[in-house]
Amino acid sequence: MTVQTTVPLLDLKMQYETLRHEIEPVIKDICDSQYFILGPKVAEFETEMSASVGTKRALGCASGSDALLLALMALDVKAGDEVICPSYTFFATGGAIRRIGAVPVWADIDPISYNVTSATIA
């Protein structure tokens, strides 16, 4: 007899519970205003984000996949270019690279930081 255990892809319940009191009023404001695309909350987010990271501008995206694609486009990555990326990542990382026609080059990660480092790329 085999017992099958299902591991959820991504469980954000615990994280959501800690942020619920911040998230729900904003969602209500957006629903009440009917500004589902762009609108004042997006402009506010972009202003706060650019100030937070010290840039002139920030751009809110519909998804992390869109953000990765736009970043590659902003860097003028072309079809056939190689892009180094971590081997321990969400599948959208490689997907954005392939979508633009580039080639993902998988690099190992540092076991403590889980990031690509100069040592893991070499």
Where are these regions (language model features)?
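Conserved PLP-binding active-site segment in aminotransferase class I/II-type PLP enzymes
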Residues: 1-74, 78, 100
